[in-house]
């Protein structure tokens, strides 16, 4: 093809003569594509090795006939322009070049580019034939297609948008032969890259030099989750292998981005074979370069489909298409027939590329994720069929999707292998749900069998969920490697012994491993090379991933805990509830009869099934319908339990038809059927049984339901039929199976319902009667009133039972009522008394029928009323239940108010008994009129007298009547203020009406009055009026007073005012009296006695007879008016006449000033009130002496008076001068005197000048407010908060009751709680000392006051809250978590530390406060029980480096296996304990030691007779291996048990033989136990009579290196049967006695050991008490021998008080806020790291280090950098790991004036290293490093002179460091001093940035004493407690009960000795006790037993009780 399309022959050449005529030439092929008419072929051109671009271009122009001036470009096929710079590296031999008008010009016609690829075509073509092979029945074709998808994923990895990959199966014969096309929208390939693709095994890592590649300069992608980096096109073989596996020809079509050309390459087996046959270059070919959508070169009909594919290129910017033709027929069939299978396989391979790192999770909302852009679509086109199109994202049944969606939880981990090898792993848990495993089955390769119908008596055993499938599928760079899987790892394989989770849980996990490219895979990507080997290498590190973070931990324990958690959370089993008991089921085979637990309910998948519930079965023949009776669960269960399997017992329904019970597996219950459907089936079956009754009334008189009938009404005859549900009549029960001859009867009953119960009054039974089925006659005897029920009941013929098969037979009940009949007679009801004349009343009537039942009147009747002497009539009579004759009125005379008796006859015409007599008593009626005496109309009386009236109240028949509240009034008119007469006539109806005297004022002549007499309560009674003539009275009526002046008398009227000079006397007062007729009355002695005056107690009677009154003294004050009164009083009148004396002022005498509005004036303000100035007389009475002109004469003077605002005004209304605007110049508060002067008068007043109104709040005795005050969380503030109200001039404002409050943030808590305070009388409020609780950091407080509804804000207090380094918050427990805990051994060491709030370890803690508790874990909870074992910590060893840690060493592990809980506690105080997290340990059995029986058999007694029973030694003997503590162990041991008979003497050869005449027998030992069913002697076996022999059971276990102690069973041998029986009884008694003796001895030994331990404890407590007492004596503290605890308590209280006072004393402190310690790597600010006791030294050193005081010291640079970042670089930091420590000073070095240990000169000023004055509360070593670097060898002396002298001397011998003086001077190390920069300011100028002072030494001494006293108190209490326990134990041992037990032991030992003698057991046997009993622990006489022994004794004493003995 190249020759055909080539240019002219030979071609041109370019070069120089030195090129040697072709040697070293390069041949290039040139296509001229400038114009469309250009030649189609290429022109070969020879280029010399040394040619340049200019020569080459000239040659091109010459060859193609182009003018050199013409513009054109020469490019490569990749459109790379050839220039001078790239000519040599681009123009290579064989290269194809374009001649274009521009680089971006379209190819007007296609070109062909020669390419070479190295391998033989057979290597290429057949590479795919054998690389893809089938494994486990899988077709490899999907894996070959996956190779092409790999290439597409790599090509699209850089796509920003959708990464689209299409696989098109073109199987439509009308479009050509079958083909497979894989198309992607990746970056495409240039022609050179396409050439590279054709080169076999050209890996991306080896493409360099001549090979241009999209992977040139390969760089590994950055790590991403699951290694989903699309870097999976790897080796240069996959695509070609896949192509030639699928078909025999491949067409590669590709267009790179930003390229104008499409490159096309065809490789085919046919073409290769043709070239080989023609001896052509078989590994060369052509790449066709063309424009997009150009398909003119497709001429073969077999490839017609390519036209459509090429047309689609127009819309694509870049793409690559692989078109495979010549597809193998078997592949075509597979692709067609198994479309879903292989697309599902591809979805599995690329699951995580399609769905992302988390897989195909079921998401509730569609989230946009970076992996949603991969779109792999597969389509298959067939002739005449709708195309099949599937997107791999839509496939939901690939295995990974099934794994993801059926998993309940996941466990993620990571493995690091050989450096960069990383494997991410995930394990998913598929729980068991009720009756099935949820582990997904592969739909294509199902491993589970279909459900088969099981027999009812079979047990369904659920097999493992995963089956034999491995756990892990393996993914490489995110894609599946299908033929490699990993079975498991050591840490996730099922354990040999039961672990935390059941074994079956290990079969419920699936997993996936995701490796990066550091693991080798085969070139076909089917298998890993060595993944499993590397992962299972011992150096592989597994870590767990939690919340995306990698955590180093024990992967096996973490996995076990996770699996246990999954099992507990997600595994769901059937819950059996309502436990009823355990039974055996004899209906089952013998091995399955029991035990069976029975339950009344189960809970299955949220649904509850209970006994009695209707259910239906499935998979049973026939299907069962019935009700649940109970549930069965195999096993000895007790209470509620979760389990699988189980059976349900069903009572077949309806029971009337199916009287049987069936039992089926619970799994066969139909959970889908509704209970309604079951109920309907039962009802349909029940339709055959009698259902209802049909009742008719052939003769009438029908009884209707709920009918009400009159008494005596008959009930008609009844006709009855029995019907079933189908409406069919029946007379007997259906079906022969139910005893079909059973007839049915109908029973009739009439029942009366009464309050006393139901009473049966009629009862009949009817049989079926042929024509009339069932019949009952008419009933006429029902007369009683009440509710009735007529009941018809179907009953059985023989038994009269009304139920059948537990179901009631049909019945019918008709309820009716019987009421009364029509009325026949009557009687009177209860009447309303009394009866009054003219007052209507009612007569109630009661009617009865003929049976005496109460009836009602329903007809019209006119009653007749008659009574002698009375007039009677009525209004009406009412009908109905309450019949009443209404409105009966009687009129006539009665004798008195008590009334009169009458007989009233009532007649009702029409009744059988029509009349009745009613006796009544008639009382007088209501009042109707008044009768008044005297009868005269005009009455005459004198004024001032009373008048009586006689009144009577009468009714309408003129009878005197009475009633309640019958009150008669008499009202007078004609004058004011007349009295009212009242009289009560309620009882008698008559009385005398009178009252007070009639008094009319100022009556001068006769006057006429009117009197009206009436009854207010009786409006119907007319009033009576009388006329009264009133005459004037002759008694005293008026009194007058006169003042006589000369001969003239002036009347002083009543209430007159008399003006008189103040202090004077009024003389000559007289009086006169007159009657009502104005007649003067002469004063007699009797009248004079009745005259009184109020101004003097003594009256001259002689003067009164003359009409003279006593003199009146006038008051001295004009304000004090005098009230004078003259009064007269007798029996008729009371008179008075009064006047007021008003004093008048005298002459002017004084000037008086008066303050109004208070005498205090606030500073800066005017006096609120005014000063009023007046002129007074001698008595102080004001005189009107001022006028407006008087103001000029007034002067005001005072010290500090501000006269600028003084205002004086004349007050005309008060005749005074007002002075306002008094103000003082601000100054010290106090009293101010003011002098007021007017003319010759003057006066002084004193004013108090006080502070101004509150304007400020100041803090008293508080540090600087600008800096934050450091406070440790939970501690007190340094000072109390005291605030003072001040005015604006800072004068204290003494305003009390002003509310003071603190404002703060909600997260800042103060104790005591923030309450409102009020200021005291000084204006000061003490808020007290607060304890502060807040999160660490800066917080603010502000004091505010509320004054006059306005807020006065005080200063803001800044608090820097620091964590409390002394407050314990948790316990840190460290121990070896990999250690195993064997019973009876020793625990690993536990290291406990108490962690404070700042995450540091709290040190100096009394070890006695740390304890360890251990108890056995139970189901009741994790709280420690009361009897939990408690341990104390061990003493600190020398090699214990960590300070503040406590160690629990060598603590004994419990003897019994099980799960134990350990918890450590720190006693914070007497009541609060800080507990650690609980440590759960599993105690395992110890080493196997001995062979023991499960149940110790009795000592056998046998003989050698024929009877097997007499020769049987052992039956059902179970032997197992235990450790020293009787824990069963050795479960994994396998071997044999050798049974041998031995005698007491080794020489004894005449020993019995086993059956078979053998001396030894072997028994298998499996799973830690051996079962010996029976052991029988041989018949006529040798042996001596009455001799004891031994059976030695010796274990032989090959896997166990040590020898175990055998089990030895003694037995007695006899030759005589009878003797054997006797001896057997004795042997049994001997065994009982032996057991009893052992129990008694155990009790006594345990009691004695407990006693010894108590003595030991007493001794230890006594020694401890003595030791502490001696230590207290060293501190001069003596403790008395009596009343020790009260004395210690008092001492402690006093010492604590002293210590608290010392701590509260103010001492120097650093107020610089400390930096919050975020971690243990932060030490704090330098100012807080050290303390200095001396104030002067502290001042100068703090100043010297002023620039460093704020620096935060950290241990690491990382921590420093973190603080730097947090503060944006504002905080200076100092990391200790950056300090060069070799230059640090030696803290032990002597001062410079010492040379070689000798004094060089005598210094002055007490020199000392500055660093030696520092004390460090914490972190001493780190602090020495810091201050050693900062201070170096700085020396401090007393003063500057001493420092200068010291320096002068030191420099003579060595370098002199910086010198500081206690006076604050500094001499630098260079000798410079002086100036402000070398002089320390005063302490208060350092702004709190000063080193604090340490706690006083006395405080530390007190702390030691307090600690000792507390320990001594505990020791005294402990000694007292153990003494009491010892005494109690001694008393217990002396009790009669213990003595009795001792006697019983002695008797048992005697009896045992006698029995042994009878048995013939000689003392020789006792030497062989070692054969049967393990050696006992030796005890010594030491009262203190070993620790282990004491513990054992204590435990045994706990266990052994009296009942055991």
Curated annotation (Swiss-Prot):
N-acetylalanine modifications at: 2
Subcellular location: Chromosome
Domains as described in the record: Atypical member of the structural maintenance of chromosomes (SMC) protein family. Like other members of the SMC family, has ATPase activity, which is probably necessary for its engagement with chromatin, and a SMC hinge domain. However, the SMC hinge domain adopts an unconventional homodimeric arrangement augmented by an intermolecular coiled coil formed between the two monomers.
Resulting phenotype, residue 552 to Q: In BAMS; no change in protein abundance; does not affect ATPase activity
Effect of residue 479 to P: In FSHD2; decreased protein level in fibroblasts as compared to wild-type protein
Protein's organism: Homo sapiens (Human)
EC number: 3.6.1.-
Effect the entry attributes to changing residue 518 to E: In BAMS; increased ATPase activity
Self-association and partners: Homodimer; homodimerizes via its SMC hinge domain. Interacts with LRIF1.
UniProt PTM comment: Sumoylated with SUMO1.
GO MF term list: ATP binding; ATP hydrolysis activity; DNA binding; protein homodimerization activity
Positions carrying Phosphothreonine: 1499
Start and end residues of each stretch annotated as ATPase activity domain: 111-702
Crosslink feature (Glycyl lysine isopeptide (Lys-Gly) (interchain with G-Cter in SUMO2)) location: 1374, 1496
Outcome when changing residue 524 to S: In BAMS; no change in protein abundance
Main location: nucleus
Family: Belongs to the SMC family. Highly divergent.
Effect of residue 139 to H: In BAMS; no change in protein abundance
EC category: hydrolase
Designated name of the protein: Structural maintenance of chromosomes flexible hinge domain-containing protein 1
Mutagenesis / variant outcome for changing residue 868 to N: In FSHD2; decreased protein level in fibroblasts as compared to wild-type protein
Record's keyword terms, sorted: Acetylation, Chromatin regulator, Chromosome, Disease variant, DNA damage, DNA repair, DNA-binding, Hydrolase, Hypogonadotropic hypogonadism, Isopeptide bond, Kallmann syndrome, Microphthalmia, Phosphoprotein, Ubl conjugation
């Amino acid at each position: 093809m190249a020759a055909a399309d080539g240019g002219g022959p030979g071609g041109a050449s370019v070069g120089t003569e030195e090129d040697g005529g072709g040697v070293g030439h390069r041949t290039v092929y040139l296509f001229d594509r400038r114009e469309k008419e250009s030649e189609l072929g290429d022109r070969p051109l020879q280029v010399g090795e040394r040619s340049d671009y200019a020569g080459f271009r000239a040659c091109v122009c010459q060859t193609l006939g182009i003018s050199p001036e013409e513009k054109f470009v020469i490019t490569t096929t990749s459109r790379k322009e050839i220039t001078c710079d790239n000519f040599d590296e681009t123009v290579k031999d064989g290269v194809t070049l374009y001649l274009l008008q521009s680089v971006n010009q379209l190819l007007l016609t296609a070109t062909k580019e020669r390419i070479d690829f190295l391998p033989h075509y057979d290597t290429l073509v057949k590479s795919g034939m054998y690389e893809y092979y089938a494994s486990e029945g899988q077709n490899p074709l999907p894996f070959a297609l996956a190779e092409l998808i790999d290439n597409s994923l790599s090509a699209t990895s850089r796509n920003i948008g959708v990464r689209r990959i299409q696989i098109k199966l073109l199987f439509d014969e009308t479009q050509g032969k079958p083909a497979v096309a894989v198309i992607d929208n990746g970056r495409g390939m240039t022609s050179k890259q396409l050439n590279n693709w054709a080169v076999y095994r050209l890996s991306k890592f080896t493409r360099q030099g001549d090979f241009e590649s999209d992977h040139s300069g390969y760089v590994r992608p950055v790590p991403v989750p699951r290694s989903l980096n699309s870097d999976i096109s790897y080796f240069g073989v996959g695509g070609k292998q896949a192509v030639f596996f699928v078909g025999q020809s491949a067409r590669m079509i590709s267009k790179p981005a930003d390229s104008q050309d499409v490159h096309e390459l065809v490789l085919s087996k046919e073409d290769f074979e043709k070239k080989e046959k023609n001896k052509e270059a078989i590994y060369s070919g052509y790449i066709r370069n063309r424009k997009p959508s150009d398909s003119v070169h497709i001429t073969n009909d077999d490839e017609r489909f390519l036209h459509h594919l090429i047309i689609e290129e127009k819309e694509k910017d870049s793409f690559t298409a692989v078109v495979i033709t010549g597809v193998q027929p078997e592949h075509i069939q597979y692709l067609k027939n198994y479309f879903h299978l292989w697309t599902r396989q591809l979805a599995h391979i690329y699951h995580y590329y399609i769905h992302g790192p988390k897989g195909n999770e079921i998401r509730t909302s569609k989230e946009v994720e970076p992996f949603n852009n991969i779109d792999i679509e597969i389509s298959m086109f067939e002739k005449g069929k709708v195309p099949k199109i599937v997107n791999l994202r839509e496939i939901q049944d690939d295995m990974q999707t099934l794994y993801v969606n059926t998993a309940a939880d996941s466990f993620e981990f990571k493995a690091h292998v050989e450096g960069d090898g990383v494997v991410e792993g995930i394990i998913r848990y598929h729980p068991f749900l009720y009756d099935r495993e949820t582990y997904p089955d592969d739909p294509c390769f199902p491993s589970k069998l279909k459900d088969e119908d099981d027999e009812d008596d079979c047990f369904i055993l659920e097999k493992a969920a995963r089956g034999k499938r491995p756990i892990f599928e393996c993914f490489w760079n995110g894609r599946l490697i299908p033929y490699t899987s990993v079975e498991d790892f050591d840490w996730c394989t099922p354990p040999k012994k039961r672990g935390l989770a059941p074994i079956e849980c290990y079969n419920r996990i699936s997993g996936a491993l995701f490796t990066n490219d550091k693991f080798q895979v085969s070139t076909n990507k089917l298998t890993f090379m060595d993944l499993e080997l590397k992962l299972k290498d011992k150096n592989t590190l597994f870590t767990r991933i939690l919340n995306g973070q990698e955590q180093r931990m024990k992967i096996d324990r973490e996995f076990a805990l996770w699996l246990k958690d999954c099992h507990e959370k997600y595994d769901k089993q059937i819950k059996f509830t309502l436990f009823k008991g355990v039974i055996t089921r004899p209906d089952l085979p013998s091995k399955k009869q029991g035990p069976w637990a029975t339950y009344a309910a189960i809970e299955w998948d949220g649904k509850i099934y209970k006994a009695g519930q209707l259910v239906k079965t499935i998979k049973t023949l026939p299907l069962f319908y019935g009700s649940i009776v109970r549930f069965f669960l195999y096993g000895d269960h007790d209470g509620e339990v979760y389990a699988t399997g189980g059976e349900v017992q069903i009572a077949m329904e309806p029971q009337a038809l199916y009287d049987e019970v069936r039992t089926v597996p619970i799994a066969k219950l139909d959970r889908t059927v509704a209970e309604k459907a079951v109920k309907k089936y039962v009802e349909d079956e029940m339709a055959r049984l009698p259902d209802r009754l049909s009742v008719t009334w052939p003769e009438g008189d029908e009884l209707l339901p709920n009918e009400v009938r009159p008494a005596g009404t008959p009930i008609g005859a009844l006709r009855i039929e029995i019907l079933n549900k189908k409406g069919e009549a029946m007379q007997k029960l259906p079906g022969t199976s139910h005893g079909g001859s059973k007839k049915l009867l109908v029973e009739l009953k009439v029942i009366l319902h009464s309050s006393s119960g139901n009473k049966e009054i009629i009862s009949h039974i009817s049989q079926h009667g042929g024509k009339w089925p069932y019949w009952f006659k008419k009933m006429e005897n029902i007369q009683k009133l009440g509710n009735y029920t007529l009941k018809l009941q179907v009953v059985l013929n023989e038994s009269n039972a009304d139920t059948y098969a537990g179901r009631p037979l049909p019945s019918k009940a008709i309820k009716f009522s019987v009421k009364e009949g029509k009325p026949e007679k009557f009687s009177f009801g209860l009447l309303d008394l009394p009866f009054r004349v003219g007052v209507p009343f009612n007569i109630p009537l009661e009617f009865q029928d003929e049976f005496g039942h109460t009836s009602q009147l329903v007809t019209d009747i006119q009653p007749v009323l008659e009574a002698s002497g009375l007039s009677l009539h009525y209004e009406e009579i009412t009908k109905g239940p309450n019949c009443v004759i209404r409105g009966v009125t009687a009129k006539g005379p009665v004798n008195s108010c008590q009334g009169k008796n009458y007989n009233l006859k009532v007649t009702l015409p029409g009744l059988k008994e029509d009349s009745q007599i009613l006796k009544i008593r008639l009382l007088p009626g209501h009042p109707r009129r008044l009768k008044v005496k005297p009868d005269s109309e005009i009455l005459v009386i004198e004024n001032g007298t009373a008048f009586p009236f006689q009144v009577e109240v009468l009714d309408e028949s003129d009878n005197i009547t009475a009633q309640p509240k019958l009150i008669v009034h008499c009202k007078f008119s004609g004058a004011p203020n007349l009295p009212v007469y009242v009289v009560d006539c309620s009882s008698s109806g008559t009385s005398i009406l009178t009252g007070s005297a009639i008094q009319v004022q100022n009556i001068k002549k006769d006057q006429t009055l009117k009197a009206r007499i009436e009854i207010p309560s009786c409006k119907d009674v007319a009033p009576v009026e009388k006329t009264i003539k009133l005459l004037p009275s002759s008694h005293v009526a008026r009194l007058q007073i006169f003042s006589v002046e000369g001969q003239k008398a002036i009347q002083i009227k009543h209430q007159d005012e008399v003006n008189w000079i103040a202090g004077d006397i009024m003389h000559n007062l007289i009086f006169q009296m007159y009657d009502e007729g104005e007649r003067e009355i002469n004063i007699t002695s009797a009248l004079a006695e009745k005259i009184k005056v109020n101004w003097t107690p003594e009256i001259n009677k002689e003067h009164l007879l003359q009409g003279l009154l006593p003199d009146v003294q006038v008051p001295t004050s004009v304000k004090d008016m005098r009230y004078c009164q003259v009064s007269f009083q007798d029996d008729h009148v009371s008179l008075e006449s009064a006047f007021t004396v008003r004093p008048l002022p005298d002459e002017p005498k004084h000037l008086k000033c008066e303050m109004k509005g208070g005498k205090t004036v606030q500073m800066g303000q005017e006096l609120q009130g005014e000063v009023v100035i007046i002129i007074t007389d001698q008595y102080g009475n004001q005189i009107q002496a001022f006028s407006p002109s008087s103001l000029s004469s007034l002067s005001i003077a005072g010290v500090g008076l501000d006269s600028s605002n003084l205002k004086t005004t004349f007050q005309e209304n008060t005749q005074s001068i007002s002075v306002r605007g008094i103000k003082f110049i601000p100054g010290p508060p106090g009293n101010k005197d003011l002098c007021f002067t007017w003319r010759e008068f003057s006066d002084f007043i004193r004013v108090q000048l006080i502070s101004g109104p509150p304007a400020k709040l100041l803090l008293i005795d508080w540090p600087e407010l600008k800096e934050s005050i450091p406070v440790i969380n939970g501690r007190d503030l340094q000072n109390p908060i005291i605030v003072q109200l001040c005015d604006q001039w800072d004068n204290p404002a003494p305003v009390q009751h002003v509310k003071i409050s603190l404002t703060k943030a909600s997260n800042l808590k103060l104790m005591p709680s923030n309450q409102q305070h009020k200021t005291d009388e000084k204006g000061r409020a003490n808020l007290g000392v607060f304890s502060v609780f807040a999160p660490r950091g800066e917080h603010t407080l502000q004091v505010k006051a509320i004054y006059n509804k306005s807020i006065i804000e005080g200063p803001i207090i800044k608090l820097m809250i620091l964590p409390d380094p002394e407050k314990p918050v948790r316990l840190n427990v460290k121990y070896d978590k990999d250690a195993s805990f064997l019973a009876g051994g020793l625990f690993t060491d536990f290291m406990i530390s108490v962690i404070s709030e700042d995450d540091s370890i709290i040190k100096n803690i009394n070890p006695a406060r740390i304890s360890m508790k251990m108890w056995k874990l139970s189901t009741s909870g994790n709280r420690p029980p009361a009897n939990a074992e408690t341990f104390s910590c061990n003493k600190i060893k020398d090699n214990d480096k960590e300070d503040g840690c406590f160690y629990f060493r060598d603590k004994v592990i419990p003897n019994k296996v099980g799960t134990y809980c350990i918890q450590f506690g720190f006693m914070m105080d007497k009541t609060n304990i800080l507990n650690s997290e609980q440590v759960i340990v599993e105690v395992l059995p110890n080493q196997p030691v001995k062979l023991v029986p499960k149940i110790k058999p009795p000592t056998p007694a046998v003989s050698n007779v024929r009877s097997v029973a007499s020769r049987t030694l052992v039956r059902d003997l179970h032997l197992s291996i235990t450790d020293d503590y009787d824990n069963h162990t050795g479960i994994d041991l396998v071997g044999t048990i050798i049974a041998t008979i031995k005698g007491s003497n080794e020489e004894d050869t005449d020993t019995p033989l086993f059956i078979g005449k053998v001396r030894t027998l072997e028994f298998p030992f499996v799973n830690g136990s051996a079962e010996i069913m029976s052991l029988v002697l041989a018949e006529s076996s040798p042996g001596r009579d009455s001799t004891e022999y031994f059976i030695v059971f010796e274990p032989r276990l090959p896997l166990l290196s040590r020898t175990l102690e055998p089990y030895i069973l003694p037995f007695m041998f006899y030759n005589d049967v009878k003797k054997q029986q006797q001896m057997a009884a004795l042997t049994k008694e001997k065994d009982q006695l032996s057991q009893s003796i052992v129990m008694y001895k155990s009790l006594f030994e345990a009691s004695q050991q407990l006693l010894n331990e108590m003595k030991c404890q007493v001794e230890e407590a006594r020694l401890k008490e003595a030791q502490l007492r001696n230590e207290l004596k060293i501190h001069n503290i003596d403790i008395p021998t009596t009343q020790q605890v009260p004395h210690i308590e008092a001492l402690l209280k006093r010492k604590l008080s002293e210590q608290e006072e010392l701590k509260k004393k103010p001492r120097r402190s650093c107020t610089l806020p400390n930096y919050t310690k975020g971690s243990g790597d932060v030490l704090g600010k330098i100012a807080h790291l050290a303390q200095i006791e001396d104030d002067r030294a502290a001042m100068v050193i703090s100043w010297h280090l002023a620039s460093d005081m704020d620096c935060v010291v950290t241990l690491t640079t990382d921590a420093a950098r973190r603080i730097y970042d947090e503060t944006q670089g504002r905080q200076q930091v100092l990391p200790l790991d950056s300090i060069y420590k070799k230059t640090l000073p030696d803290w032990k070095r002597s001062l410079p004036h010492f040379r070689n240990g000798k004094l060089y000169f005598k210094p002055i000023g007490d020199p000392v290293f500055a660093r030696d004055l520092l004390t460090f509360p914490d972190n001493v070593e780190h602090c020495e490093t810091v201050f050693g670097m900062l201070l170096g060898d700085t020396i401090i002396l007393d003063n500057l002179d001493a420092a200068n002298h010291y320096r002068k001397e030191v420099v003579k011998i060595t370098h002199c460091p910086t010198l500081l003086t206690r006076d604050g001077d500094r001499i630098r190390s260079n000798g410079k001093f002086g100036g402000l920069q070398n002089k320390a300011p005063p302490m208060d100028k350092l702004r709190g940035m000063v080193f604090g002072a340490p706690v006083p030494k006395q405080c530390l001494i007190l702390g030691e004493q307090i600690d000792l006293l507390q320990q001594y108190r505990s020791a005294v209490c402990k000694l007292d407690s153990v003494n009491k326990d010892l005494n109690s134990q001694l008393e217990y041992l002396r009790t009669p009960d213990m003595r009795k037990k001792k006697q019983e032991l002695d008797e048992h030992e005697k009896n045992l000795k006698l029995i042994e003698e009878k048995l013939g057991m000689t003392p020789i046997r006792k030497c062989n006790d070692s054969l049967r009993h393990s050696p006992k622990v030796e005890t010594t006489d030491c009262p203190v037993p070993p620790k282990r022994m004491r513990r054992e004794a204590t435990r045994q004493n706990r266990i052994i009780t009296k009942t055991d003995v």
